[in-house]
Swiss-Prot record:
Keyword flag Phosphoprotein: yes
PANTHER family: DORMANCY-ASSOCIATED PROTEIN 1 (PTHR33565), DORMANCY-ASSOCIATED PROTEIN HOMOLOG 1 (PTHR33565:SF11)
Stimuli inducing this protein: Circadian-regulation. Down-regulated in axillary buds within 24 hours after decapitation and then up-regulated. Down-regulated by the transcription factor ERF114. Down-regulated by heat. Up-regulated by salt, cold and dark growth conditions.
Record's protein name: Dormancy-associated protein homolog 1
Keywords for this protein: Developmental protein, Phosphoprotein
Gene Ontology annotations of biological process type: response to bacterium
Gene Ontology CC, one term: endoplasmic reticulum
Species in which this protein is naturally found: Arabidopsis thaliana (Mouse-ear cress)
Superkingdom, natural source: Eukaryota
Length: 108
């Protein structure tokens, strides 16, 4: 599926030809320095190189907290202290609040 509004007319053969072209467009810079000037900027189609990272640095497992929420000792009891225990003896629990008549979803 090709969207002509966003991408323009569909190419006849393939996108490989489009990637190899170098496009130049004039860039007008006005009000910078003395007077106005026009410069041409060449944009090369393609992707930039991948930055290198040091191999000796150990990466932290970013998914640890998602798949093992209780693995962080500093935040282990945070959820139970905040959400599972009511702050006042007569205050509703999360379940009571979600399914009470006032706050329950009317969509059926």
């Amino acid at each position: 599926m090709w969207d002509e509004t966003v991408a323009g007319p569909k190419p006849e053969h393939g996108l490989g030809r489009l990637r190899n072209k170098i496009t130049t467009q004039p860039l007008d810079i006005k009000g910078v320095g003395e007077g106005s000037s026009s410069k041409t900027v060449a944009a090369v189609a393609g992707s930039p190189g991948t930055p290198t990272t040091p191999g000796s640095a150990r990466k932290e497992n970013v998914w640890r907290s998602v798949f093992h929420p209780g693995s962080n000792i500093a935040t282990r009891g945070m959820g139970t202290n905040l959400f599972d225990k009511p702050s006042h003896p007569n205050s509703p629990t999360v379940y009571d609040w979600l399914y009470s008549d006032d706050t329950r979803s009317k969509h059926r």
